[in-house]
Amino acid sequence: MNQKKICYLTYQSFPAETANSQQTISNIIHLTRNNKDVKLIFPLREKNSSDSIEKIKKVYNFNENFSIQGISHNYPFGKFNIFSKSSFHISHYLWAKKTTKKILSSEEHFDYFITRSDWVFYFLSKNKRSVAFEVHQISKIRKLILFVRRNAPNSKLIFLNELLQKQLHSFTSLQNSTVLHNGVDVSNFANLPKKQKEVVFVGSLKRFNKDRDLRFLIEAFNISELASTHRLKIIGGPQESVEELRDYIQKKYSDLNIEIKGRLSRFDAVENIKSAEIGVLLNEGSNDHSKYYTSPLKYFEYLAGNLKIIASDFPAHKSLPYSKNILFYKDGQTDKLKDALNKSISVKPAEFNKNNISLDTRAKKIITFLET
């Protein structure tokens, strides 16, 4: 019997320092570990885009082999700084239409497709291909496409959390959808070192082109009991934000035990999580995606690393697996974050079933969803 082939066809760019690119690569790695023949196809739309498997392996720190094909991208998005939103939608539509037509008319056969891209989903669904669309947020175009293709029998939807599925239920057919939170490669957390007295934030210092409010975290840490016993460690980029934070700390909190490490490799970031005692999730409260629809990769890494976890009391965070163990604080209220930091001294990390947060389990569920 021939092995079923899966094509992960997406408008994302690789390699990239983004959580969404990490999530896609992680999915593919674990589908591959489950003996699936997977091919990643994406546009070469950024200056640093590359379909070299060795470059991809180095950035995302893995050893598995799978097929990668970068497709040329002769469209405006990424080439100009003006009208970026409009150029994204136009370029996305044109690239998806041309690329899906090319793939479907080629001699290479795929049994299933997975995508995170609206127009890729639309054209594959329209051509009656078996496709699973990973839905991570809401947009007007997405609602329209989901509504138009809601009764397509081979078109399936994977929602990142229950709130997202509920919000889009009137645009979809629920029998063709499922909810799968993000997960973690638990093998990376098999051997945990002795915990250091560290509070850690790991992630991009910007989200949706806005600064994550790291100053808010620093101010709360400064007035907490942990300021005299723990180190606050902030890991992430871009470098411009790193330098701004370092200047801010030098001017206002030079006596505090704070380390701004900037971006680290995947391996080094995981090692820092494993040795920390407390992990903090910060999100932008004015953004609906952050507030309602996210399932942060870092949450699952903190959980697997046996960290005590502090997070803003957003509905998305409250819908996470094992959320009853999270120390919640009111977004934007320094005193409440200080209280959560103080409380973390006396609580224990969450008890959890590794299989429930494993990317391997998630991959198995995706395979079952595709094949039924």
List the predicted regions and their residue ranges.
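Nucleotide-sugar-dependent
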Residues: 19, 208-212, 267-272, 279-301, ...
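Short amphipathic alpha-helix
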Residues: 20-32, 217, 298, 366
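Nucleotide-activated donor-binding/catalytic signature segment of Leloir-type glycosyltransferases, i.e.
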Residues: 236, 244-273
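N-terminal strand-loop element at the rim of the active site
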Residues: 10-18, 30, 36-91, 121, ...
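Carbohydrate-associated surface elements
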Residues: 163, 183
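Conserved donor-binding/catalytic core segment of Leloir-type glycosyltransferases
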Residues: 7-9, 158, 184, 192-222, ...
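A charged, aromatic-enriched C-terminal amphipathic alpha-helix characteristic of glycosyltransferases
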Residues: 187-188, 332, 339-372
